[in-house]
């Protein structure tokens, strides 16, 4: 199992829009989120977040808080504990509470969940985000469950993306040791890079 941890915060004209904008800020605003209970496979791999295909069905553990009371400080926290046989996730939120204390509470809870299951903790990762409300604000932290079906390019490729795609294709050619001529890029954007058998763009 592979996961990524993301967070975002933002304002909006309404509480719903603020929440939506916070999801967009976290990179998960263009997918359908399916909230799951807080269990992971053993030796779950934590990865950097990558763009997701718009409209995908994405499983996640979501910690979210929204307020339309100006001046409120809202905090969302997720804590992940990874073990050999399984892992656990907890979420915690608070309004005008000490973020450090909320993090400590989340860590305590996830440690307890692992302890009650007689599972030794190999790693704990915590993500916290705090936002001071101006009008209507929201903060979210989420553990996203990744798979090949939901990961993909989003939008047009800039020069940095083109270089990454070119370097990746060249690396594949060298490692596999076969004569291949892949096209890399986003078919819908109309921007392609054709890689020759020698690994150079053509």
PLM region spans:
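Helix-coil modules at protein/domain termini and other flexible surface or pore-lining loops
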Residues: 1-202
């Amino acid at each position: 199992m592979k996961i990524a941890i993301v967070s975002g915060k933002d304002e909006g004209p309404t509480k719903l829009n603020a929440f939506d904008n916070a999801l967009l800020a976290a990179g998960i605003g263009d997918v359908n989120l399916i909230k799951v209970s807080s269990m992971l496979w053993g030796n779950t791999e934590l990865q950097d977040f990558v763009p997701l295909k718009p409209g995908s069905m994405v499983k996640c553990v979501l910690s979210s808080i929204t307020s339309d009371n100006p001046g409120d400080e809202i905090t969302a926290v997720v804590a992940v504990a990874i073990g050999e046989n399984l892992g656990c996730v907890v979420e915690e939120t608070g309004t005008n509470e000490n973020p450090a204390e909320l993090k400590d509470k989340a860590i305590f809870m996830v440690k307890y969940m692992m302890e009650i299951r007689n599972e030794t903790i190999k790693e704990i990762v915590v993500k916290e985000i705090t936002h001071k409300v101006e009008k209507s604000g929201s903060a979210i932290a989420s553990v996203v469950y990744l798979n090949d079906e939901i990961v993909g390019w989003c939008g047009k490729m800039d020069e940095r993306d083109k270089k990454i795609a070119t370097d990746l294709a060249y690396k594949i050619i060298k490692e596999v040791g076969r004569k291949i001529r892949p096209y890399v890029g986003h078919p819908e954007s109309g921007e392609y890079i054709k890689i020759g058998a020698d690994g150079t763009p053509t």
